[in-house]
């Protein structure tokens, strides 16, 4: 538990500040709930029900990227889009979990859906270490540009920062962390 806290704590602190600044708290909550659908899809596709991480990460990253893409193409508010996509994802995930529960014990999925830092296993720690390393390598070259784009997007554009690219990178980082 201490290893997990030491790995993820500094990343959450730094990224959390930008999440609040960009008013994306609802987005991170939506990604967390969309994970249910990723888990159900993974179990349906044959991943082990104790660790359907590939489908979980894939679904959540696609979920975040689609929301961001749609936000950039419409004039709807972010919260409206997030609410719509969240509702669709939860409905799909709930339906798939009902179908999946006939094949596996639904209580076995609870440890993934409602995890606790006190009940992490070796696989969770390996996934966390790999995620932290990847996020660290992505953050180092982009951190200053992310901070500038978070606090003052207009200044970032004037300074030549590709704000859209930074936004997509930030979405992926928040999605993986969540």
Labelled PLM ranges:
Residues 3-4, 51, 55, 59, ...:
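Alpha-helical transmembrane segments of integral membrane proteins
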Residues 82, 86-140:
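Transmembrane helix-bundle core of multi-pass membrane transporters
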Residues 1-10:
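Membrane-interfacial amphipathic/re-entrant helices at transmembrane-helix boundaries
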Residues 11-12, 19, 62-66, 89-93, ...:
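Membrane-embedded alpha-helical core segments of multi-pass
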Residues 121-178:
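Helix-loop-helix "hairpin" substructures at the membrane interface of multi-pass membrane proteins
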Residues 13-22, 40-51, 147-158, 172-178:
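Short juxtamembrane and helix-loop transition motifs at transmembrane-helix boundaries
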Residues 68, 72, 111-118, 154-158:
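Short amphipathic alpha-helical coupling elements at transmembrane boundaries
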Residues 17-103:
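Short loop segments and helix-boundary regions at transmembrane helix junctions
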